[in-house]
Curated annotation (Swiss-Prot):
Keywords: Amino-acid transport, Cell membrane, Membrane, Transmembrane, Transmembrane helix, Transport. This is Lysine histidine transporter-like 1. The chain crosses the membrane at residues 45-65, 66-86, 123-143, 165-185, 188-208, 232-252, 277-297, 319-339, 360-382, 386-408, 413-433. Belongs to the amino acid/polyamine transporter 2 family. Amino acid/auxin permease (AAAP) (TC 2.A.18.2) subfamily. It comes from Arabidopsis thaliana. It is a multi-pass membrane protein. It comes from the Eukaryota. It is found in: Cell membrane. Residues 1-44, 87-122, 186-187, 253-276, 340-359, 409-412 are cytoplasmic. PANTHER family: OS05G0424000 PROTEIN-RELATED. Residues 144-164, 209-231, 298-318, 383-385, 434-453 are extracellular. GO terms for biological process: amino acid transport. Amino acid transporter. InterPro entries: AA_transpt_TM (IPR013057).
């Protein structure tokens, strides 16, 4: 903006400062209109439903019977229900805190963290954990997509020569070299809808096909491990496996940012409606698969319940194909906040001009990087079970409670105060125990790990 001068006399400093401020606001608006999280705010409430379902229901749902076997009936059902309740509560907290400051929206998890913990500390606490979860999940989904494609190929073409997993990961990644150029959350709503439907579909196939098989002869529900130490460590692994199945909080504020908001109709109303429906869908996916799978196969169930089913072949093949379609959408949901972080850093800190070329380079590099790591370390999911424990538990179970206590300061020993502290303690215990179990799994499985398999 040019500063006008009258009779050779510059405007007063106050006017120059105002003009500079207006320029900054205009530039900020231009950037916000380009960034993926804030560029579109016209989402409907049901968008949040399938975004949350896609983010939360991963292919790990097929491993729930295996984790139930490590916990047993009583503890398994308790963890399944308690995790559902706690994460629904912490998700409600985040939805409420999105617009707690009148006239301001915390569109990103780290923005809420900065408000609660301070500008610098909030970044240091939130961003590393978000990156671990979001980038880690994207890598795992690269491998999962490739593995499911490989399994589908093996079933559909049993006489074909075996093909390395690496090539199936490349095939899976090719879809993301295209889809990753969709600019924002609203533009991937169709992909997310398909993914949400697929998650419900393959979960339904898994538990109905298992139920049709009937309870196996000589089924046993006791702990499978031989020693007490092994049983306890397996218990820790199962605890983390079930609890982290609900860890979708890393993208909830970014999803809510796409919903329009006015003082009379804030975004928390439609967002919460979508979250409740999403959690009903999640329960319809998780509970039948976990309970029916464990009930039919007992402690002999494999870590993917589909692998415990030998027939019908068509159902197993179809379910694997549905898994591929689901993790395509899930990858995009978790990649979008990463795109936003990187693109924000480039245009705000390094002063790159917002452009299609910049976006093209950033997103292709990210997809290529996650693909390469997935090919190089196809056992990355096992590593994430350990390292992810330090990020999944905080971001989903107790960081929202800590921020709630810091911001709202509920009266000591009130119901809100007690509820949040109970969630914090349980979350910290979960983080420690599940990480111990994850480390044990790495040690056990390390002999089977191979790079570039």
């Amino acid at each position: 903006m040019y500063i006008q001068m009258t009779d050779g006399v510059p405007p007063p400093p106050e006017q120059s400062s105002l003009d500079h401020r207006i320029d900054e606001l205009e530039r900020q608006k231009e950037i916000d209109d380009w960034l993926p999280i804030t560029s579109s705010r016209n989402a409907k409430w049901w968008y949040s439903t399938f975004h949350n379902v896609t983010a939360m229901v991963g292919a790990g749902v097929l491993g729930l019977p295996f984790f139930m076997a490590q916990l047993g009936w009583g503890p398994g059902i308790a963890v399944l229900i308690l995790s559902w309740i706690i994460t629904l509560y912490t998700l409600w907290q985040m939805v409420e805190m999105h617009e707690m400051v009148p006239g301001k929206r915390f569109d990103r998890y780290h923005e809420l963290g900065q408000f609660a913990f301070g500008e610098r500390l909030g970044l240091y606490i939130i961003v590393p954990q978000q990156i671990i979860v979001e980038v880690g999940v994207c890598i795992v989904y690269m491998v999962t997509g490739g593995q499911s494609l490989k399994k589908f190929h093996e079933i559909a073409c049993q006489d074909c020569s075996p093909i390395r997993l690496s090539f199936f990961i490349m095939i899976f990644a090719s879809s993301h070299f295209v889809l990753s150029h969709l600019p924002n959350f609203n533009s991937i709503s169709g992909v997310s809808l398909v993914a949400a439907v697929m998650s419900l579909s393959y979960s339904t196939i898994a538990w109905t096909a298992t139920a049709a098989k009937g309870v196996q002869e000589d089924v046993q529900y006791g702990y499978k491990s031989g020693t007490t130490a092994s049983t306890v460590l397996s218990f820790f692994t199962g605890l983390g496996g079930i609890a982290f199945a609900y860890a979708g909080h890393n993208v909830v504020l970014e999803i809510q940012a796409t919903i329009p908001s006015t003082p009379s109709n804030p975004s928390k109303g439609p967002m919460w409606r979508g979250v409740v429906v999403a959690y009903v869908v999640v329960a319809l996916c998780y509970f039948p698969v976990a309970l029916v799978g464990y009930g039919v196969f007992g402690n002999a169930v494999l870590d993917n319940v589909l692998m415990s089913l030998e027939t019908p072949v068509w159902a197993i093949a179809t379910a694997n194909l549905f898994v591929v379609m689901h993790v395509i959408g899930s990858y995009q949901i978790f990649a979008m906040p990463v795109f936003d972080m990187v693109e924000t850093f480039l245009v705000k800190k390094l002063n790159f001009k917002p452009s299609t070329v910049l976006r093209f380079i950033v997103r292709n590099v990210y997809v290529a990087l996650t693909m390469f790591i997935g090919i190089m370390i196809p056992f990355f999911g096992g590593l994430l079970a350990f390292f992810g424990g330090f990020a999944f538990a905080p971001t989903s179970y107790f960081l929202p409670c800590i921020m709630w206590l810091l911001i709202y300061k509920p009266k000591r020993f009130s119901l809100s105060w007690w509820t949040n502290w109970v969630c914090i303690v349980l979350g910290v215990v979960l983080m420690i125990l599940s990480s111990i179990g994850g480390l044990r799994q790495i040690i056990i499985q390390s002999k089977d790990y191979s790079f570039f398999s």
